[in-house]
Amino acid sequence: MSSGRVLVLALVLSACLFCGCISTDRPASSKEPGNVNVVATTVPLGHFTEMVGGDRVTVAVLVPPGTNLHTFEPSPSKLAEVEDADLYVKNGAGLEIWMERIIQANEEMLVVDSSSGVDLIESTDADDHGHGAHDFHEDILTTDPHIWLSPKNAIIIVDNICRGLTEVDPENAEFYQKNRDHYLSRLRELDGELNSTFSETDRKEFIVLHPSWSYFARDYGLVQVPILESEKEPGPRYLAEIVEVACEKRITTIFVDPNFNPKSAEIIAEEIDGRVVPLDPLAEDYIENMRIVGREIASSLDG
């Protein structure tokens, strides 16, 4: 065989390998050629991954927007999304109780625990997350999984994601690190803004339907007062206590998570002649959303 024909054959074989015509240990991926295929548990984690990965990553989110994180179960179609992933970004902190099923769907992908290095909050089953004064509940320690709702934690999470991308795609390490550094500077700026905002508020207590904001409260010296008891609708005694706290602390705003039934919040708001305001913990544009959250909570403390 001539050297020319050998060269042509080699080029054809190389092209087949690149296009997936020759099977490898991993199934063919539908991702953009050359991209790192990433699946993230939540919309914010997917957003962080895109901020670091830029056009070098293709990101899918496992838990769809508008879904209750605490009741979500991955369907077969969702598990199929994981099969081609190079990297899975999990929330950690006990959120993904179904994580073993994710790993079984793709044992070769790298799993990044975004909670690694975060100072986790342990709380009672009453969901007071260290910020309430309700001692009549059964004390069962759990871990608060809402770690991303703290700009300080977000800095740690973004760095964890960058490490994961660098491990699976070392050739683009400098690209990921540059994007990470740029986004971290924006997160630090956000943290500074929020520190300044809440240092000027005299009152610190705010009432929420679902206790998503424990880490946010810890960051800025606030006191979160939750309505829901362990994902269950509260009884009359607990509702009466919340109303008493609201009157004592001059609270007139009840913050609700759009993914939860607002009925209890509306009852309390009516009792205190207050208002119900939504705060979305899963909004896609993290920095803009946290600025909105900061403005709304600060406004409620000044009212």
Labelled PLM ranges:
Residues M1-K31:
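Secretory targeting signatures
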